[in-house]
Each structure stands twice: as C-alpha cells, then as structure tokens.
Swiss-Prot record:
This is DNA-directed RNA polymerase subunit alpha. It comes from the Eukaryota. The gene is rpoA. In plastids the minimal PEP RNA polymerase catalytic core is composed of four subunits: alpha, beta, beta', and beta''. When a (nuclear-encoded) sigma factor is associated with the core the holoenzyme is formed, which can initiate transcription. The N-terminal domain is essential for RNAP assembly and basal transcription, whereas the C-terminal domain is involved in interaction with transcriptional regulators and with upstream promoter elements. HAMAP family: RNApol_bact_RpoA. It comes from Triticum aestivum (Wheat).
Length: 339
C-alpha cells in the first residue's frame, strides 16, 4: 500500500477503470479508481476488497488425475518424456473457465508420438480452456495414452494427503484462485479541512475472468456478507425499544416467520435468508451453489428443481420441509413446494 499527496477536487463518490490490458492469455491487468473518500475510508475499502479478491473468488481447477497401472507419482511411463509427477504439475497449471458446481469428469486420450497440450483435454460443455497451448506431456513413441480427470469449482488452496492409489488415481493440490495479485495505493487530495482520499486498485487475474469481473464478484460477496445488518429496522428492534436491554434480540428465522404469520407489517420473503433456517451445512451449501439465497428463492423452486441441484439428496429435501412446516402456514407451502 502506497500513500501520496496529490491535487484533487470534491465530487460525488464514483469509480472507473483507468487502465486495462491483456499481457497474455493467462495474465490480465486492470487498474481502478474510487474517489473521493473521507480520510481513513480508502484503507477500509482497500483492505476489504484485497482480502475478498484473493480469498473469496471461486475458480475451476483439475483436482484429480487417474492413470493406468502406475505404482506411484514418481514413476515414469515408457514412451513419455515426463514423469507422472511432472504431468500432475502441468495439469495443476491448466487454467479453466466455467460456472459449474460440483465435480465434473474430463479426459485425455491420444496416440503418440506427439506433444499433449491443454487442447487435447475432452471437457464437459460447461468448461472452457483459457490457454489451449499449455503443455502437459510429450509422447516420444507410438503409444496410446489416456488420463481420466476430475474438475471442481472451489475457492482458495486445496490440499490432500499424499498417498498411492491402487487404481492409479492421484490428487492434485488445486489452486482455485483466479486473482493472482492485488495491490492498492491511496492518494490524498485537497487542502485544510477539505482533504479527501483517492483509492487506486490494481488487479491481476489468470485469464479465467477479467479484473472487472473479479472486482464485481468480490464486491458482491462483501455486500452479501453485510446484508443481514441492513434489515435491522424490519425487525422492529429500534434503539428506543432496546436501549435498556443488555443483549439486543437475535434476528432469528423463527421471529421473522412469526411476524409473517401474524400478517402485520409483513416481512418480505426476500428478506429472510436461508442461513437463518438453521439448516445443516451440507443442505445450506447445496442451496447456495444453486443461487438460492432467500426464502423467496427457495419457495420459488419446485421439488424437481431442488433435486436437480448437484449433490442434493432426498434427506436434504425432507430436512428443508420439516424446518418450513414448523413455521410457515401449510397452505403457503402447498402452493409453493410440491414435496
């Protein structure tokens, strides 16, 4: 982080992209500006965005590779220049672009002699290779070479215990981080008591998404994180009503639904978030992956819609129904969900 003094003027808060370039297929760069900010706000925004960009953006990676009869990852395969470990490292570097959730299968099946590149990977329709020229292996002899792959969308750095698999399957330590680096600098402007700050944000990505897309997703994640605090007034928890209480009332799912059934001021269904339903972490994650964030989103889905969600099971369906049945009018449930 860099802080400098520059001349500037006071305007309505706004942001824009001041520089954008593509250095290579796997290196995009963007520079953004946000101004004017009061003293201290630039640091607050810069720190939050940097952490969200580096840790909260999801990416798609190859997470597992299955060879034929290979005793361990340091083995060599006749007719292939690289060892199994080198092939795994090359697969780890492949950059993919997709919006898929859950695990997907892919494969490579070629005949040598020839170079194998990312272009030779047979992918599901929802996945795209960013740089098809990325190397994987070099077949030096006329042999048939096949690899079964698993692809997964996740965030952060995923590691698995190293061990030999009898079926020739090996995990790959996936780096699901589309944003390669983030830097921000702060510039002070104005004179006397009219000083303001300008935030410059630099973003480098691996090509699976643009810096602008990454900034949008990080901002969306931060907004979602703070959304529950924006509905405090809807709970009727005003300061005057609670100033003598030691602990403020919790914004629980049960209380929201009680207000809903009393049909008083009516809490909108889109203001009740699924993280307040006290669901299991498994059921909650399934719904989030399907972009179901509120009770309105959930009640808009049919049973068939839910069962089409990746990894969603009948047990999850029953768990959701049991939770809603205890709190919502049965007529509403019958109209919305055909469980």
């Amino acid at each position: 982080m860099v802080r400098e003094e520059v001349a500037g003027s006071t305007q309505t808060l706004q942001w824009k992209c001041v520089e954008s370039r593509v250095d290579s297929k796997r290196l995009y760069y963007g520079r953004f500006i946000l101004s004017p900010l009061r003293k201290g706000q630039a640091d607050t925004v810069g720190i939050a965005l940097r952490r969200a960009l580096l840790g909260e953006i999801e990416g798609t990676c190859i997470t597992r590779a299955k060879f034929g009869s290979v005793p361990h990852e340091y083995s060599t395969i006749a007719g292939i220049e690289e060892s199994v470990q080198e092939i795994l490292l090359n697969l780890k570097e492949i950059v993919l672009r997709s919006n898929l959730y859950g695990v997907r299968d892919a494969s490579i099946c070629v005949k040598g002699p020839r170079y194998i590149t990312a272009q030779d990977i047979i992918l599901p329709p929802s996945v795209e290779i960013v740089d098809t020229a990325q190397p994987i292996a070099n077949l030096t002899e006329p042999i048939d070479f096949c690899i079964d792959l698993q692809i997964k969308r996740d965030r952060g750095y995923q590691t698995e215990l190293r061990k030999n698999y009898q079926d020739g399957s090996y995990p790959i330590d996936a780096v699901s981080m589309p944003v390669r680096n983030v830097n921000y600098s702060i510039f002070s402007c104005g004179n006397g008591n009219e000083k303001h700050e300008i935030l410059f944000l630099e973003i480098w990505t691996n090509g699976s998404l643009t810096p602008k897309e990454a900034l949008y997703e990080a901002s969306r994640n931060l907004i979602d994180l703070f959304l529950p605090f924006l509905h405090a007034e809807e709970e009727g928890a005003s300061f005057e009503e609670n100033k003598n209480r030691f602990t403020p009332p919790l914004f629980t799912f049960q209380k929201r639904l009680t207000n809903l059934k009393k049909n008083k001021k009516g809490i909108p269904l889109n203001c009740i978030f699924i993280d307040q339903l006290e669901l299991t972490s498994r059921t909650y994650n399934c719904l989030k992956r399907a972009n179901i964030h509120t009770l309105l989103d959930l009640l808009s889905k049919t049973e068939e819609d839910l069962l089409r969600i990746d990894s969603f099971r009948m047990e999850d369906r029953k768990h959701i129904w049991d939770t809603l049945e205890k709190h919502l009018p049965i007529d509403l449930l019958k109209n919305k969900l055909s469980f």
